[in-house]
Structure formats: structure tokens, C-alpha cells
């Protein structure tokens, strides 16, 4: 009887049918075959890395295969020893190795991830800008997406700033209006002022009035351009234009501009709200009404808390876009700097507090950040945007 013994070790082969257990194969033959388990190598060649019962089944189980011509009675005689050896081999498997987790490791990793995510979110929600003679800090509120914006335009002649525009904008009802105003208003104001400047001498008695009129026209033109798009929402604004030694400040709504003269704060704008007697009278004379809610906030048509703004087409009959404009000569007035901010600051910080904070920070982005943080600590849930403009760079006031 011819016999071939395959006893050389074979590398384990991964097989879906056996869950990765070792499979020992043999060549096919046209003769009848019988699988014999050799007692000496049945356990040695068995793959002990698997705990699956299927890995120890009839597909080989790591046993040596003997191919021979055999009588049926011989096949029966080797079946029982093979099953017995497989059972013994199963009992010899080492226990499953379990590596215990370090106490508190998961909690520490989760806490670190939360801190990182919070820091990234804060960086996305906060913005700081350090420009040439101006600084900006802004932070998103807690109630909705960021709806504040700002704009700066400077014109230089022979290396000196002869004209500059600065603006802070506070949107409501989405970002459409504030984005439009931030992109258009500054250009419209500068173009109108430059046209007026070229048409007459700055020293003429009517020049200042004409510049103020040009600023009003630029505001109204910007509003008309936005309304023509049929887009909802609105925006408040406070802007400053420095031209030929004069400071022109204009505003709509409750954005505010405050100047520091020898350390004393003075508001150059007046908030446009229904709480103002003259604004309430204007609205009522136009057929509208104002009301005070349970939270003490006055609103136009039970809707809007400001009486002048860009956009707000449904209320345009009463909520106009014509700004109030003031002129301040810079020469000899002790002018130091200008603070322009959205109502997220002014609802929590007084004019003098803002001036004191900027003076203590020596005109820097840190001053703006300090004011933003002050408003948040005092409970402001609104967007807060603060811009500081150095006025001394235009003239030695």
C-alpha cells in the first residue's frame, strides 16, 4: 500500500469559510481518498489562534492529511481517534487575553476633544483686524448666526491719508442686507464725497453742507439698490468719513459712534429707536404706530426695534434709510480716537467706559477685544463688533 505523508508545516491561509484558521490541502487524485489524522502531529499543526468551533471542523483543522488506497473499514477506524484528538486540542487553547482599559482614559480623551472643538468654534466665531490706524474686534452672539459687518476705505495722496471711510454694520433677518451694505455703502459715500469735493473748494461756506448732503444721498442710493433685489432683511449702520480735516459721522438705527476728546466721551450719533419722541411722532404722523412689549422694548408695528435702517421693505413707509449726519472739525478740538460699535456693545457698556478702555489699551486691537469681552461678561447675547479709529493720524488735534 502506497502512502504519502504531508507533515511539513505550511503557512496559515486566511479563508472566509474558516474564519482565518489554517487550512492544509492536498493534491487531487482519481483514486479514492481518506483523510487520516496522525496522532503525533494533530495538535502540533493545529491553529490555536482561533476560538471559533468552525475552525476546528472538517475542513482540515491543521491536521496532517494522508492520501492512500484504503478499505472502507480502515476509514471507519480512524474517524473516532481524529474526533477525540480535536476535542483534546480544543481544551488546550490558551484563555482569551483581555487588556484592561486605563481608568479615566476615555473621559480624558473626550474632555480634550471637547476643549479643542470649543476653541476652534470660538476662533470661527471671533474676528480681529489690525489695520493702518484702525482696529476691529468682533464676536458672534448666542442667539443666531453672525450678522455684524464692517468696512474701511482709505485714499492716499502723496503718502498721506486725505480721505478715509469707516463703518460698522448690524444686520437683522439674515446676512443679506449687512453683506450688501458692507460691500456698497463705503464706495457710494466716498464716490459722492469725492465728486462734491472736486466740484467746489473745501473752504467754501456751503462745502460742509454739501458733503453732508452727498452722504445722505449715498445712504439712500444704497438702500434703493438693496430693495431693488427684493431680498428680505435689514441692517443698521454707523459710519465716519474723514475728509479735508473734517469728521462726518452718519448713522441708521442703533449702531453708535463715540469720540474721545481729552479723555472725555461724546456721542456723535443718536440711536434711532421708537423710544425717541421725535421718531415716534414721525412714524405716527405717517400712519404707523409704535408699541412697548412686556420686555420694555419699543417696536415699530409690533415688529422692529429701530426706526431707521437699510432694507426692511415691508416697513419702509415708516422705517426710512435717511441718516442723520454730523460734522466735527478735527483741528484744535483735542480729538484722540473714535469708537464705532454695534448695539451689542452699547447695550452693556457706557460711552465713557468704552473710551476709558481704549485709552488704557493705547489704541490697539486689545482695546477692542477688551470691550467685546466686557459686553459678554455683562450678559450681552447679541453680536458685538467694535472698531477704534486713531484720529491723530489725520491731524495733530
From Swiss-Prot:
Domain of life: Eukaryota
InterPro entries: PP2C, PP2C_BS, PPM-type-like_dom_sf, PPM-type_phosphatase-like_dom
Cofactor requirements of the protein: Mg(2+); Mn(2+)
List of residues binding Mn(2+) 1: 170-171
One Pfam family, short name: PP2C
Enzyme class: hydrolase
Entry's EC annotation: 3.1.3.16
Xref: PROSITE patterns: PPM_1, PPM_2
Keyword Zinc part of the UniProt annotation: no
UniProt KW keywords: Hydrolase, Magnesium, Manganese, Metal-binding, Protein phosphatase
Binding, Mn(2+) 2: 170, 343, 382
Note describing how the cofactor binds: Binds 2 magnesium or manganese ions per subunit.
Domain PPM-type phosphatase: 133-391
UniProt xrefs under Gene3D superfamilies: PPM-type phosphatase domain (3.60.40.10)
Any one GO biological process: signal transduction
Any GO MF annotation of the entry: metal ion binding
Reaction catalysed by this enzyme: O-phospho-L-seryl-[protein] + H2O = L-seryl-[protein] + phosphate; O-phospho-L-threonyl-[protein] + H2O = L-threonyl-[protein] + phosphate
Family according to the record: Belongs to the PP2C family.
Identification of the protein by name: Probable protein phosphatase 2C 74
Organism: Oryza sativa subsp. japonica
Amino acid at each position: 500500500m502506497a502512502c504519502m505523508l504531508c507533515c511539513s508545516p505550511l503557512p496559515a491561509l486566511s479563508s472566509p469559510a474558516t474564519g482565518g484558521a489554517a487550512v492544509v490541502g492536498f493534491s487531487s487524485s482519481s483514486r479514492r481518498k481518506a483523510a487520516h489524522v496522525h496522532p503525533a502531529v494533530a495538535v502540533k499543526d493545529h491553529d490555536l489562534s482561533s476560538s471559533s468551533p468552525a475552525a476546528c471542523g472538517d475542513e482540515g483543522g491543521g491536521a496532517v492529511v494522508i492520501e492512500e488506497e484504503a478499505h472502507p473499514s480502515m476509514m471507519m477506524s480512524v474517524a473516532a481517534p481524529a474526533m477525540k484528538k480535536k476535542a483534546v486540542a480544543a481544551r488546550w487553547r490558551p484563555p482569551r487575553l483581555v487588556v484592561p482599559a486605563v481608568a479615566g482614559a476615555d473621559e480624558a480623551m473626550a474632555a480634550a476633544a471637547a476643549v479643542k472643538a470649543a476653541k476652534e468654534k470660538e476662533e470661527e466665531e471671533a474676528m480681529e483686524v489690525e489695520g493702518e490706524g484702525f482696529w476691529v474686534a468682533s464676536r458672534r452672539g448666542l442667539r443666531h448666526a453672525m450678522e455684524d459687518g464692517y468696512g474701511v476705505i482709505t485714499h492716499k495722496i502723496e503718502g498721506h491719508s486725505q480721505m478715509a471711510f469707516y463703518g460698522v454694520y448690524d444686520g437683522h433677518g439674515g446676512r443679506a442686507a449687512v453683506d450688501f451694505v458692507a460691500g456698497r455703502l463705503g464706495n457710494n459715500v466716498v464716490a459722492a464725497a469725492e465728486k462734491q469735493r472736486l466740484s467746489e473748494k473745501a473752504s467754501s461756506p456751503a462745502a460742509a453742507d454739501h458733503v453732508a448732503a452727498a452722504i445722505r444721498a449715498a445712504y439712500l442710493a444704497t438702500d434703493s439698490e438693496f430693495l431693488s433685489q427684493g431680498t428680505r432683511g435689514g441692517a443698521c449702520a454707523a459710519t465716519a468719513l474723514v475728509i479735508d480735516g473734517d469728521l462726518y459721522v452718519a448713522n441708521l438705527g442703533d449702531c453708535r459712534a463715540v469720540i474721545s476728546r481729552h479723555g472725555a466721551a461724546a456721542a456723535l450719533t443718536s440711536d434711532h429707536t421708537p423710544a425717541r419722541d421725535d421718531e415716534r411722532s414721525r412714524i405716527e404722523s405717517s400712519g404707523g404706530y409704535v408699541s412697548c412689549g412686556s420686555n420694555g422694548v419699543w417696536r415699530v408695528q409690533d415688529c422692529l426695534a429701530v426706526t431707521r435702517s437699510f432694507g426692511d421693505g415691508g416697513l419702509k413707509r415708516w422705517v426710512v434709510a435717511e441718516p442723520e449726519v454730523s460734522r466735527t472739525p478735527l483741528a484744535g478740538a483735542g480729538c484722540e480716537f473714535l469708537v464705532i460699535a454695534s448695539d451689542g456693545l452699547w447695550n452693556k457698556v457706557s460711552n465713557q467706559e468704552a473710551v476709558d478702555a481704549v485709552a488704557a489699551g493705547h489704541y490697539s486691537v486689545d482695546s477692542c477685544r477688551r470691550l467685546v469681552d466686557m459686553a459678554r461678561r455683562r450678559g450681552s447675547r447679541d453680536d458685538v463688533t467694535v472698531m477704534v479709529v486713531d484720529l491723530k493720524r489725520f491731524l495733530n488735534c
